Amino acid sequence: MSQSTATYINVIGAGLAGSEAAYQIAKRGIPVKLYEMRGVKATPQHKTTNFAELVCSNSFRGDSLTNAVGLLKEEMRRLDSIIMRNGEANRVPAGGAMAVDREGYAESVTAELENHPLIEVIRDEITEIPDDAITVIATGPLTSDALAEKIHALNGGDGFYFYDAAAPIIDKSTIDMSKVYLKSRYDKGEAAYLNCPMTKEEFMAFHDALTTAEEAPLNAFEKEKYFEGCMPIEVMAKRGIKTMLYGPMKPVGLEYPDDYTGPRDGEFKTPYAVVQLRQDNAAGSLYNIVGFQTHLKWGEQKRVFQMIPGLENAEFVRYGVMHRNSYMDSPNLLTETFQSRSNPNLFFAGQMTGVEGYVESAASGLVAGINAARLFKREEALIFPQTTAIGSLPHYVTHADSKHFQPMNVNFGIIKELEGPRIRDKKERYAAIASRALADLDTCLASL
């Protein structure tokens, strides 16, 4: 198939990946037609018509370079990511993590793209894969049925999917502050989380209520397949009575403050379990329950989650919800630049490619956008080094075993190993990998 001669590039979908792709293309002097159906057709999970809306959590996760997602974010900053730049401008306290005011952040991304002289925003639903120009499809896990059918046809008719869920958000003014305390785990960064401590008795009662609560039904013909990083809390609880204690309710590093006077198990300095609440907006009026993605019926959410100390009278401004995520057989369908193997004028980006997470989705949009622009200019494709996070992630999702392919977060395990003797200390090893990654990225960019 010959290269398109159109004078613009299409980007379909203005989520994190599509917004990033559109910006990267326009930044390189190429006109963009950015299509977004929200505004004329709603999705089950989005609450606004803003671009790059955060549906699940407001966290971009860890910020340290000894954390793989922290490394990926730093690489994206060096590549002038619109998502990272606007995220930084709308940060809220989150200890060692990067969390944002979700409304302020999405509004700022939307304004920047809508006001860009080379970006034409078209509020319309796309039901066919365009063939008029180079196109980046970044319609996300909530792709409309009509377009999803066409994409699945590329997939040989097979639809890969999993379920993920969003956590509830509560009104801070309805939290009983006498029962909670402010602290970040291991006192890392500023004290940014409200912690709801539980005794063993309280935890056992909560676990019992959670595992017997009524869930909203799934379609009968679909299996319950979850992405491990966004698993409903009730599913986690059913795996074992202590599973949550090693996950979102882990008490380690969250010792009681000296002035704590609430119930505790004997003289223990650390609670048996802790539920953490994270600030959700810049004003600090909303908090989400960290790691409590759920598919319980709304009435059950209120009943069970009000058992958490401090939340007895909490008002929920948004209940947790679950949605179906579809993704492609990327190992068979896409190249390392997220370009279609069968149609070189077609790129994909975002969660539909098998990357998982906000940051990873934006990173895939960055890679696809840069390479769509390079194709437009008849330049050689840019494949980032496998020693970098932004190079290793697309390499993984396009080279994985297709038969067992599942969505993947960025992690140090997919980045090329260091040469020489293995560094035993994990933090030192990760720091060395990060240092090499940033040096290699700088070298790569300098050569362009």
UniProtKB/Swiss-Prot annotation:
InterPro entries given in the database record: FAD/NAD-bd_sf (IPR036188), MnmG-rel (IPR002218), MnmG-rel_CS (IPR020595), MnmG_N (IPR040131), TrmFO (IPR004417)
Matching Pfam families: GIDA
Key words, A-Z: Cytoplasm, FAD, Flavoprotein, Methyltransferase, NAD, NADP, Transferase, tRNA processing
Q: Name one GO biological process term.
A: tRNA wobble uridine modification
Q: Major place of localization? A: cytoplasm
Residues the entry annotates as binding FAD = 13-18
State the EC number(s): 2.1.1.74
Record-level Gene Ontology MF annotations: flavin adenine dinucleotide binding; tRNA (uracil(54)-C5)-methyltransferase activity, 5,10-methylenetetrahydrofolate-dependent
Cofactors: FAD
Which Gene3D superfamilies does the record cross-reference, listed alphabetically?
FAD/NAD(P)-binding domain
Q: Which GO terms describe its cellular component?
A: cytosol
UniProt subcellular location: Cytoplasm
Catalytic activity of the protein: uridine(54) in tRNA + (6R)-5,10-methylene-5,6,7,8-tetrahydrofolate + NADH + H(+) = 5-methyluridine(54) in tRNA + (6S)-5,6,7,8-tetrahydrofolate + NAD(+); uridine(54) in tRNA + (6R)-5,10-methylene-5,6,7,8-tetrahydrofolate + NADPH + H(+) = 5-methyluridine(54) in tRNA + (6S)-5,6,7,8-tetrahydrofolate + NADP(+)
This molecule's function is given as: Catalyzes the folate-dependent formation of 5-methyl-uridine at position 54 (M-5-U54) in all tRNAs.
PANTHER family associated with the record: GLUCOSE INHIBITED DIVISION PROTEIN A, METHYLENETETRAHYDROFOLATE--TRNA-(URACIL-5-)-METHYLTRANSFERASE TRMFO
Per the record, the similarity remark reads:
Belongs to the MnmG family. TrmFO subfamily.
- The protein in question is named Methylenetetrahydrofolate--tRNA-(uracil-5-)-methyltransferase TrmFO
Species of provenance = Streptococcus pyogenes serotype M4 (strain MGAS10750)
